[in-house]
């Protein structure tokens, strides 16, 4: 039974791509406020951040991660020619292992659990022993993105397919707080309203065209004017159209910029990555919502999955970590006030 005044925390970190860098700041906030993380359970990116924390390498990992730029990120992608997946996934794992040495899960300083999905049997695979980075690599294997991991009779892909927020396998000590961080929330009503407003505003200006033909068609009505006057009139009207067209293009850019700053998903082009990523995120959001109806953590921290949804978010780890810390701090404030 949970002791409401305990400082012990069983931490559960959900699947969620680059949004999971929020867990770095969240862990730092927990420790700064005197909480004692007694176990960590993670799925996909949650298994990565949680595993590195359990191995005592979070600070070194953070320093490496926070200096990544687009160029360095590309250098970590071992692109594959396979028709089944885009990235082999070994380069990035090896780069992290150079910073945080591999270790057996049973030798970690606190209990750790990671979850993957058996692609063929549909069963959940829970890692509680064996090599840490084998567990992490299995858990992060997003279908079509990373090469599946074969271990024994298992062919493993991302654990989020079955268990996005693995609260059910968390290691508890009988009096700890279950603290869950889910980065897969979606506000459908807000997105629908924003989508309607976005297209209404964009259509208003996108219809603007440089209609020189329309100006020329008005010339017969100006036949009483001299040739010089007509030429001047055409020039003036054309100039007005050009200014109007420039204004329209600028407005469209401003609308796109505001939507991007608000992390609205419809600003992105419908490319292979964005469609795959969003489809997978929608699945994670659905699974997470159902799990949170079944399991009630003592403290739940939530982040919208549109917060950092595209591939460039992997170079925004500092910003994401700071946001995670702020969200965790707010959740702790609310919990402590309720005591």
Residue ranges and their predicted role:
Residues 1-43, 51-339:
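Patatin-like phospholipase
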């Amino acid at each position: 039974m949970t002791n409401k005044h305990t400082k012990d925390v069983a931490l559960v970190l959900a699947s969620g791509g680059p949004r999971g860098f929020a867990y770095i700041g969240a862990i730092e906030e927990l420790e700064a406020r005197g909480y004692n993380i007694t176990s960590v359970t993670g799925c996909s990116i949650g298994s990565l951040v949680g595993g590195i924390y359990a191995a005592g390498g979070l600070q070194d990992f953070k320093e490496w991660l926070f200096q990544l730029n687009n160029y360095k990120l590309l250098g970590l992608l071992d692109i594959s020619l396979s028709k089944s997946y885009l990235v082999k996934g070994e380069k990035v794992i090896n780069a992290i292992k150079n910073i945080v040495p591999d270790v057996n899960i049973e030798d970690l300083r606190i209990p750790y659990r990671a979850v993957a999905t058996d692609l063929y049997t549909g069963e959940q695979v829970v890692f509680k022993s064996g090599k840490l980075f084998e567990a992490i690599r299995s858990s992060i294997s997003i279908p079509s993105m990373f090469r599946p991991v074969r271990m024994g009779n298992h062919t493993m892909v991302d654990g989020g397919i079955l268990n996005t927020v693995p609260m059910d396998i968390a290691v508890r000590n009988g009096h700890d707080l279950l603290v869950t961080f889910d980065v897969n929330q979606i506000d459908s009503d807000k997105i629908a309203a924003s989508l309607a407003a976005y297209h209404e505003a964009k259509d208003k200006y996108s219809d603007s065209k440089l209609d020189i033909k329309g100006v020329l068609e008005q010339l017969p009505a100006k036949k009483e004017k001299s040739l010089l006057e007509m030429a001047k009139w055409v020039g003036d009207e054309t100039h007005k159209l050009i200014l109007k067209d420039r204004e329209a293009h600028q407005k469209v850019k401003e609308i796109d910029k505001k939507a991007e700053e608000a992390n609205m998903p419809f600003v992105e082009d419908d490319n292979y990555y964005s469609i795959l990523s969003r489809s997978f995120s929608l699945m994670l959001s659905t699974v997470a919502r159902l799990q949170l109806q079944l399991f009630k953590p003592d403290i739940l921290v939530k982040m919208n999955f549109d917060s950092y949804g595209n591939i460039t978010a992997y170079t925004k780890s500092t910003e994401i970590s700071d946001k995670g810390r702020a969200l965790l701090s707010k959740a702790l404030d609310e919990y402590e006030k309720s005591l």
